[in-house]
Amino acid sequence: MIHHLFVLDFVMIIILQKRKRQNCMKAKILFRVLLTIICIAGAYPLISWMDSNSYKFRRFSGSFLVLMLAIPFLFSSCNSRNTKEEMQRITVKSSSDRIVSEWLDSIKVDVWAIHTDVPVAPIQSMDVIGNKCFVLDVFKRIFLIDIEKRLVLKSDITLGNARNEMLSPICLTADEEHVYVYDGMKECIFVLSYDLKLCQIVNTGCFFSTFRKIDNGFACLSMGSEQNFLFLRDDGVPVYSKQLSDKYPDEMQDGNPIQIGLDGYPYVKAYYSDTVFKWNGQELVESVQFDYGMGEPGGDYQKGSQLAHSGIAYTESYFLTNTHVLSSFVETDGRTIHYNLYDKENGVSCSGKMAPIDNVYFRATLQHGKEAYAVVLADEACVYGLKDIDMNNIVIIRYTFPS
């Protein structure tokens, strides 16, 4: 009878191992019922056998029985997973526009049109911290826009090959104290004060296309023949890298692949990728994956070329709140914007066009917690539904998500 019990234990352990891959509640309930039946079936003949033996042996066998029946549960405990940390899978499909409209109604929109005496060229990179907006235009000029004072300040740092000169600034980011401008030719980060004066130069020795300042370093995305995430320490030393996609867009887009979520953690989603990753301070972990019904195995996020051939050209923007995930894609014609909104609480995803919020369309670029921003020139304001904007104005749009 003892060896029969070992067999039962072995069967239960196998079932427990398979159970780890089960995510639905029905499977868990059926498993518990089956496990109870197996335990009872194995225990009953053993108890009858022990009754025919001495009291001392029955005491030993009883303890042995408890131990044997506890083994599968010990395996279950040691191999259990925290389902709250598992990747969230989103199946993109059409649904009622009611979900979209209700979510849009919960967003607050603020618009500032600020006059500038210095013409600003099309914006290449931007960041917003509080009432301060920092802009890098395609002419490699850096501007500070004070929203509260409605002033525009231009940096006096000149372009050149001298040590304290920028040769080819391509992106910027900011925190509560400094502005960080990355020079792609010199492969270094120029650290500026809020009045755009040079404070420090940090050598990186690596190339990337965009980055965000985060705790203890920089979250970066490099684009060459593929797209890779890099984490640099504050001293510019790269200490972590991960490939996110095997394809990159032919030209840079308006969206930002690195966003700061409501939880304060940075998230990254490469162009031509179906997976949003979260940086937990040590490594990237999968957070959200979009299923586009392509018949490919889940988690195959590196094969971005498959998305390029499926009619979805690239991700323009994505935003994560406590209740929703919004992503926008530009189709292969380069003009049609396709929105996907996922309702976490109701488990519903909606796909289609988005109505304006207070006559302003949602086309944000950058997310900082519960706020998302777009900075546009006057001639681009019509895309957002804004009218009668003076040509000497630069427009800042802030979208505030519900808490």
Segments (PLM) and residue ranges:
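Beta-strand-rich domains and repeat architectures in extracellular enzymes and scaffolds
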Residues: 111-139
